[in-house]
Structure formats: C-alpha cells, structure tokens
C-alpha cells in the first residue's frame, strides 16, 4: 500500500501531460496514480501508460461523481488527493501535505492561477477572495474552498453514504458539484479540516469569455440534476457559493464584477433555459 493515492480524472484535456509531468517530479515518492480516462483519444491512454499510471478507461460521457468513485475504489493509499487534469502540482505538494497536514482528516489546498489575459487575472483575484473570506481558521465554516486531500476512511464513508443515498441512475448523471457532495457526505467536524498556508496546486484558467460562458452554462444545466437529490446538501442550493461581504472584501468584489457577472449570467441561462 502506498501512503498517497492521487485520484485523477481526465477527459483528455491538453493540460493532462503537464499534470502528469508535475506528479513525476514530486520530492515525495511513496505514491500511486489512478486515472479515470473518459477520452476518445487513444494517445491519452498511451500517455498514462508512459507515466506509469493505473488507467481506468470509461465511456466518453462518464460523469464526474461516478469517475471520482471509480478512481477511489481502484486506489489503495492511506491518504487520497482528488485531482483534475487542469491542475498541476508544485514539486513538493505531496511531501508538504503528508508531513505538515496529515494530522487533519481533510485538507483544503490553496491554488494559484495559470494562463494569461484579463479573465485569468479576474479568476485569480476571485480565487484569493474565496480563500480569504470563506475559510475561517477558528473552524466556524468552509463554504467555498473544499478539501482535496482526505484520509482514506473519510472518503470511504463519504462514498458509502452517497451510494446509499442516491439511486444508481442519478449517481451516474451528476457531472457538477461532486466535490461539494463528497464534502457534505463526509460529515466532518470543523476541527477535522484545515487549509494550507501555501499554494500547492496550480489551475489552468479559462482565458476567453466564450470558454467561461460555455463552462458555467454547463454548470447551470447540471444544477438541475442536483435538485433531484433527496437528502440535504448545500450543493443543491443556488446560494451555496455566495461569498460573505465585509470591508476587507469590498475592493476585490468590485474588481471582479466582470467575471462574476459573466459566470452568473451563463449559469442562470443554463439553469432556466
């Protein structure tokens, strides 16, 4: 058994190789990588094989929650890192998570934005705003930044609850909000969770208004599926990602009106139409 399992999902995004390369350069070596691959492209499977990844090939339209479940059930590590193929790691990410934060049952990981242009800068400010305003060190709440690094037993219990609470058809249709569902199902106490002091993951942001609109339009459509859930979860509440207002967040909130407006309009169009 490895100490850390990286549970990766990919649809064949161009940044997949960057993520795999970042994993191969880790200063900590006792890990395994399991990747659920829903790409049509056979070159993605070859790439995963080249990097020694345990591939779980699935149908191209496999949704995110099912992909996360398959990655988890095919991994063996004592700790689990939920990763996407748009999020490369810093070279010391695994080492830092294990030796500095492993006493916690779940860890939220600060990120930094990758890319160029106006929309990337907007996303970076918004990310900093989320990390600043929605996580409180005294453990009162986590509303927007969600854990990616879990102890194995926490994820076991979370997926067990989700499989028991969601019928199989709906489980396979959930393509958005899976991180929030997993977090809610884990039923953690505030003292179980922390957020890293460092930015240990990077994120390739959408660089065009068209890409942002397409993504959040899809999120809006996917929200309809979440409304079918029979148990109480923040993920099926439209205000679950609302950032609290305070004096210290006023300026960044004003500066990010363009991206927040674009995301909101796209989401609502997808949700209602």
Explain the meaning of each model-derived region.
Residues 22-57:
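Acidic donor-binding segment of Leloir-type glycosyltransferases
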Residues 59-75:
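Glycine-rich, basic loop-to-helix element that forms the pyrophosphate-binding segment
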Residues 210, 214-273:
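Non-catalytic, C-terminal membrane-associated alpha-helical segments of glycosyltransferases
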Residues 165-184:
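Acidic donor-binding loop at a coil-to-helix junction in glycosyltransferase catalytic cores
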């Amino acid at each position: 058994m490895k100490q850390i399992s990286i549970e990766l999902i990919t649809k064949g995004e161009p940044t997949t190789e960057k993520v795999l390369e970042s994993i191969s350069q880790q200063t900590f070596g006792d890990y395994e990588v399991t990747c659920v691959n829903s790409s049509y492209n056979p070159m993605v499977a070859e790439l995963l094989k080249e990097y020694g990844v345990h591939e779980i090939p699935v149908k191209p339209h496999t949704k995110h929650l099912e992909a996360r479940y398959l990655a988890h059930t095919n991994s063996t590590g004592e700790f689990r890192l939920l990763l996407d193929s748009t999020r490369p790691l810093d070279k010391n990410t695994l080492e830092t998570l294990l030796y500095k934060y492993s006493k916690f049952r779940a860890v939220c990981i600060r990120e930094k934005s990758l890319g160029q242009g106006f929309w990337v800068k907007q996303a970076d400010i918004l990310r900093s705003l989320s990390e600043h305003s929605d996580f409180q060190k005294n453990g009162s709440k986590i509303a927007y930044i969600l854990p990616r690094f879990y102890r194995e037993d926490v994820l076991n219990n979370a997926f067990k609850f989700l499989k028991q609470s969601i019928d199989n058809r709906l489980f396979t249709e959930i393509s958005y909000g899976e991180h929030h569902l997993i977090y809610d199902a884990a039923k953690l106490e505030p003292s179980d969770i922390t957020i890293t002091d460092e930015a240990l993951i990077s994120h390739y942001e959408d660089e065009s208004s068209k890409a942002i609109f397409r993504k959040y339009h899809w999120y809006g459509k996917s929200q309809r599926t979440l409304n079918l859930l029979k148990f109480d979860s923040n993920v099926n509440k439209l205000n679950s990602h609302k950032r609290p207002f305070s004096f210290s967040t006023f300026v960044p909130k004003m500066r990010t009106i363009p991206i927040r407006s674009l995301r909101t309009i796209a989401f609502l169009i997808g949700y209602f139409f």
